[in-house]
Swiss-Prot record:
Principal place of residence: cytoplasm
Function, in words: Methylates ribosomal protein L11.
Top EC group: transferase
The keyword RNA-binding belongs to this UniProt entry's keyword annotation: no
GO biological process: methylation
SUPFAM superfamilies attached to this UniProt entry: S-adenosyl-L-methionine-dependent methyltransferases
UniProt subcellular location: Cytoplasm
Keyword terms, alphabetized: Cytoplasm, Methyltransferase, S-adenosyl-L-methionine, Transferase
Protein name: Ribosomal protein L11 methyltransferase
Family: Belongs to the methyltransferase superfamily. PrmA family.
GO function term, MF aspect, one: protein-lysine N-methyltransferase activity
């Protein structure tokens, strides 16, 4: 017997309460999305880190609850609506969810990714298409960075062209560790990866061990005091601007820095902030995202 999805559309002031009530009544999982997504009425909810959101739910929300076969959707919804004090049952729909081999289905969605001239990012369940290439074995996980996003790809292409053996590299906002691992495989040493998320740091350590790449990882307070030949930061434009002085100070005079997580329309603003410290410009653009790259001046 198949599982079912209960799909409910309602105003934002009731979305969170209904989600909690459905979970308390036995729903296996609940998610909330914008009911106006992919329409002219779609609303952005969360901005970049450092910016305060002006709302906590979409004006027109869609609550999706996954139910086991022994739950009757209409009965469960009526009970949840009653629990939160809503007098009228909102519009809803029920979808059948067939049982599948979810592991196999998920794996089928992730194929080896070629990047640059000789890099392949390969999930552990795949064989490397070219065993002589520079192989990074990486599975999709909780930490950002598998090579599929344009910003990750841009940074990897830049590192492939820029890193020389023996150079020191700092990957600030390392996520999965993909950039730090690549730098090490390109011959950089030492390589340091820093992230504010302890889970990302642990994920990066595991990925480095899997790839036999010696990288030192830690939280921001563990960042070494010295300067690096290369600093790379694939974050977002607002944090990059806030950290400009600190990140620039981690680059040796004459050393290089690469920044991504920046939309093409944000490039001039980010570059203007960093121009106080480095000679910087757009290195490459891909699918609306850019990688900014530059060199720290000998004195500033």
């Amino acid at each position: 017997m198949s599982y079912r999805e209960l799909v409910v559309e309602l105003a934002r002031e009731h979305a969170e309460a209904l989600s909690d009530a459905l979970l308390e009544l036995g729903a296996l999982s609940v998610s909330v999305e914008d009911a106006d997504a992919d329409t002219p009425d779609e609303q952005p909810l969360f901005g970049e880190p450092g910016l305060v959101p002006d709302r906590t739910a979409w004006q027109h929300s869609r609550v999706i609850a996954l139910l086991s076969p022994d739950h009757e959707p209409a009965v469960l919804l009526a009970a949840a609506v009653n629990d939160i004090g809503v007098t009228e049952t909102p519009k809803f729909d029920v979808r059948e969810v067939e049982e599948q081999d979810w592991v196999r289905l998920t794996q089928s969605q992730f194929e080896p990714i070629p990047i640059g001239e000789r890099i392949w990012v390969v999930p552990s369940w795949h064989d490397a298409p070219d065993p002589d290439a520079l192989i990074l074995e990486l599975d999709p996980g909780l930490a950002f960075g598998t090579g599929s996003h344009p910003t990750t790809r841009l940074c990897m292409e830049w590192l492939e062209q820029s890193v020389k053996p023996g150079q020191s590299v700092l990957d600030y906002g390392c996520g999965s560790g993909i950039l730090a691992i690549l730098a090490r495989k390109c011959g950089a040493n030492p390589v340091v990866g820093i992230d504010i998320d302890p889970q990302a740091v642990e994920s990066a350590r595991q990925n480095s061990e899997r790839n036999h790449a010696e990288v030192t990882y830690g939280l921001p307070d563990a960042c070494p005091a010295g300067e690096f030949d290369i600093v790379v930061a694939n974050i977002l434009s607002n944090p990059l601007k806030l950290m400009a002085s600190m990140l620039a100070s981690k680059v040796k005079p004459g050393g290089r820095i690469a920044l991504s997580g920046v939309l093409a329309r944000q490039a001039d603003e980010v570059a203007a902030v960093y121009a106080r410290y480095v000679d910087i410009s757009v290195w490459r653009e891909h699918e609306g995202w850019v990688c900014l790259a530059g060199t720290r001046r000998e004195s500033h």
